[in-house]
UniProtKB/Swiss-Prot annotation:
InterPro entries: Membr_insert_effic_factor_YidD. It is found in: Cell inner membrane. Keywords: Cell inner membrane, Cell membrane, Membrane. This is Putative membrane protein insertion efficiency factor. The lineage of its organism: Bacteria, Pseudomonadati, Pseudomonadota, Gammaproteobacteria, Enterobacterales. One of its GO terms (cellular component) is plasma membrane. It is a peripheral membrane protein. The gene is yidD. The keyword Cell membrane applies.
Length: 85
């Protein structure tokens, strides 16, 4: 079971949700990755907290450009993740 979300993680997840609901529909689908960068960010923040989750999200967003092939890289397993990978 994952630890409870910090206030910082909650704020960042709320900002990502605003982006998903208000801005992303206007831009159209263009993410090179599955899951999308915003979904990846939410999962990273939930698994790792505000510092490492933000770092993983920024690294992912910086890779989202025409010269990168994209792909399906999942969020790494977190310290409380008990699922088999």
């Amino acid at each position: 079971m994952a630890p409870p979300l910090s206030p910082g993680s909650r704020v960042l997840i709320a900002l990502i949700r605003v982006y998903q609901r208000l801005i992303s529909p206007l831009l159209g689908p263009h993410c090179r990755f599955t899951p999308t960068c915003s979904s990846y960010g939410i999962e990273a923040l939930r698994r790792f907290g505000v510092i490492k989750g933000s770092w993983l999200t920024v690294k992912r967003v910086l890779k989202c450009h025409p010269l990168h092939p994209g792909g399906h890289p999942p969020v790494p397993p977190g310290p409380f993740d008990t699922r088999e990978h």
